[in-house]
């Protein structure tokens, strides 16, 4: 063990020392829910916001969101106040100082692995009680069981992050009514999506094809994208394929569309925000995606879905799609989407088309 890790391990042990405090709630408790992760993380954990507000209508629910998912939090009617997490301590500390003054009854920590910075953050905010999901990964070679700085944890035998998050409600003595994800967006975003889709024949099945996730390892190769487009049309020519893309990517996305597909495959309109993306996904008939954020968003709207995952079964157990109709296609590799079965993607998509 190098000296740097030795210092980190001992520091983590020191800040993890903790006496369990009682959970005491009034009829109008004040909650801080940490959701400063990715878009998909917030969607998967979204049911707890609804269920807490249902059980405690006068609760004051504050959410700490990230820059990438803050719009989802701001549009959620169960959230009373949103605080945006900052990566730099000099920007984060004034926010934490303000949160400390609010004297939260309960903070809820939803990371699936141990993160030292979050432990320090909650030490500074100092809520009366901290509830946390059980951790799948430890830190610096220590197991999650060696690092337990919070008051109460969810059942460690649960695997999927949705179920682990919902177990927070058990700690609060709340019987939840349903497990569905929530994604909210304004009517304007819906009208923009419908206006774009009105350009196409209403009799067509409109498929949303997303080709990349949050990093290059979650990207479908250009050649495979072309094969998927041509393969889908070969098996059913009553379709329109919309290539979902990030703002500014329209030009290179357009170049992926084969010339022979120019009458049925098109780039999407610019989705400048998460709410634009949510609106178009909600308006499409079927989704194909390797991006777990889009996968979980499609699940929130219960859209027929073909999800493409790396062959990493631990992460799949935690983050697999949950909806009425979905198929999962695995890459042959744990760390990339190289060597995915295009025929299987096309065939599973065709099966879902028959349900529409």
Predicted regions and their residues:
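Catalytic machinery of carbohydrate-active enzymes
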Residues: 1-356
């Amino acid at each position: 063990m190098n000296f740097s890790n030795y210092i980190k391990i001992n520091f983590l042990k020191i800040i993890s020392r903790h006496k369990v405090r009682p959970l005491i709630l009034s009829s109008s408790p004040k909650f801080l829910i940490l959701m400063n992760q990715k878009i998909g993380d917030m969607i998967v954990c979204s049911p707890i916001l609804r269920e807490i507000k249902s059980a405690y209508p006068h609760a004051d629910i504050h959410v700490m969101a990230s820059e990438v998912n803050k719009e989802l939090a701001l549009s959620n009617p169960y959230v009373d106040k949103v605080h945006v997490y900052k990566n730099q301590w000099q920007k984060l500390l004034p926010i934490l100082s303000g949160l400390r003054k609010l004297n939260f009854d309960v903070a809820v920590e939803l990371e699936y692995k141990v993160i030292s910075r979050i432990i320090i953050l909650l030490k500074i905010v100092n809520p009366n009680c901290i509830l946390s999901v059980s951790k799948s990964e430890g830190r610096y070679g220590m197991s999650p069981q060696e690092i337990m700085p919070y008051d109460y944890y969810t059942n460690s035998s649960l695997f999927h992050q949705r179920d682990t998050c919902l177990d927070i409600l058990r700690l609060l003595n709340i019987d939840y009514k349903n497990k569905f994800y929530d994604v909210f967006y304004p009517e304007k975003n819906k009208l923009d999506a419908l206006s774009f889709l009105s350009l196409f024949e209403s009799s067509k099945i409109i498929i949303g094809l997303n080709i990349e996730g949050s990093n290059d390892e979650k990207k479908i190769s250009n050649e495979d994208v072309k094969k998927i487009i041509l393969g889908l049309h070969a098996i059913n020519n009553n379709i329109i394929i919309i290539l979902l893309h990030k703002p500014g990517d329209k030009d290179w996305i357009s170049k992926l569309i084969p010339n022979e597909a120019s009458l049925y495959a098109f780039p999407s309109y610019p989705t400048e925000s998460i709410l634009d993306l949510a609106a178009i996904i909600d308006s499409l008939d079927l989704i194909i995606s390797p991006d777990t954020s889009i996968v979980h968003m499609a699940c929130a709207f219960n859209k027929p879905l073909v999800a493409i995952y790396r062959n990493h079964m631990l992460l799949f157990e935690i983050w697999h799609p949950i909806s009425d109709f979905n198929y999962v296609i695995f890459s042959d590799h744990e760390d990339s989407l190289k060597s995915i079965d295009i025929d299987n993607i096309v065939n599973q998509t065709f099966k879902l088309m028959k349900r529409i």
